[in-house]
């Protein structure tokens, strides 16, 4: 169920973020740069004065360049964007607070992050993580080398939240992840990260109502109606995203994962290239 104050909750976050000076610092990482482009370590200040890190990759040549912004998955380590992608796009990969390279003063626990502060919508860690995602998008919109009309968001629920609150992006390639219908799925699963919810309820058996209330503010179905940009949703299995499709309230592209990094990667690259109008995508040799 969508909370009555859903919009005001997220508006408050944005208002808090506006008051924080981003203070960007961009330092080249020579070991990672190539003849095709440079790789930078980008530091930004996010909510609460927290410094976050992102890999910021800029190709050589005359810009502005289209952008692929990769929102992080659930895990401690974020990798540099793929080489082929970096050759003709600005490619940026965020390490949100708690992930490695953004882990001072807070180093996230895995498992554990998914329920950090979940007793209240105001203290849930993903409220601050959402601000990290928005901070990077706001940075991109200030960069002269960025083609502001061609920004593609790629990722799970963090990418969906960003698309809902930053409609300046052009496209969203979205894979529903751990927050989508999370407690319903956790009730029939013993696999992590969803098992983190079950662990939490075993430790705090009277907390279920509080957790349900918090997660309603982060449920993808409550964000979907706010996403107006061109969207591809890749679901785990056929029919898994039916409720999300209904929540979007419009036609979006939809596919089911092949459970193959090669086949899913080719499809993703081709869809993004078509939407950004960058021609045939450059793919890894072992994919061709």
Regions found by a protein language model. Give the residues of each.
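N-terminal cap/lid segment of alpha/beta-hydrolase-fold proteins
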Residues: 18-62
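Active-site glycine-rich loops that stabilize anionic/oxyanionic intermediates
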Residues: 47, 61, 65, 70-77
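Alpha/beta-hydrolase fold nucleophile elbow
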Residues: 144-155
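The feature captures the conserved acid-bearing segment of alpha/beta-hydrolase catalytic domains
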Residues: 188-249, 253-257
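Hydrolase active-site cap/lid region
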Residues: 159-205
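Cap/lid segment of the alpha/beta-hydrolase catalytic domain
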Residues: 79, 83, 89-131
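N-terminal targeting or regulatory segments adjacent to alpha/beta-hydrolase or S9 domains
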Residues: 1-37, 274, 278-288
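C-terminal catalytic histidine-bearing segment of alpha/beta-hydrolase fold enzymes
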Residues: 2, 239-288
């Amino acid at each position: 169920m969508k909370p009555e104050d859903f919009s005001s909750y997220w508006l408050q976050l944005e208002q808090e973020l506006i008051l924080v000076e981003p203070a960007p610092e961009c330092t080249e990482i020579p070991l990672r740069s190539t003849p095709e482009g440079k790789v930078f370590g980008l530091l930004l200040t996010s909510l609460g004065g927290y410094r976050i890190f992102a890999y910021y990759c800029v190709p050589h040549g005359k810009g502005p360049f289209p952008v692929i912004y990769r929102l992080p998955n659930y895990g401690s380590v974020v990798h540099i964007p793929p080489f082929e992608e970096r050759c003709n796009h600005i490619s940026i990969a965020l390490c949100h607070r708690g992930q490695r390279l953004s882990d001072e003063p807070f180093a996230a626990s895995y498992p554990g992050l998914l329920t950090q502060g979940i007793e209240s919508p105001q203290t849930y860690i993903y409220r601050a993580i959402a601000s990290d995602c928005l901070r990077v998008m706001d940075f991109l919109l200030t960069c002269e080398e960025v083609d502001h009309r061609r920004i593609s968001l790629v990722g799970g629920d963090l990418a969906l939240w960003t698309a809902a609150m930053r409609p300046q992006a052009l496209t969203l390639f979205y894979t529903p992840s751990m927050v989508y219908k999370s407690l319903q799925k956790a009730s029939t699963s013993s696999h992590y990260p969803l098992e983190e919810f079950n662990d939490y309820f075993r430790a705090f058996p009277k907390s279920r109502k509080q957790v349900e209330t918090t997660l309603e503010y982060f449920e993808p179905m409550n964000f979907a109606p706010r996403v107006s940009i061109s969207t591809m949703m890749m679901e785990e299995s056929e029919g898994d995203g039916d409720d999300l499709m209904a929540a979007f309230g419009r036609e979006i592209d939809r596919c089911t994962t092949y459970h193959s990094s090669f086949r899913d990667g080719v499809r993703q690259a081709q869809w993004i290239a078509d939407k950004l109008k960058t021609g045939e995508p450059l793919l890894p040799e072992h994919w061709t």
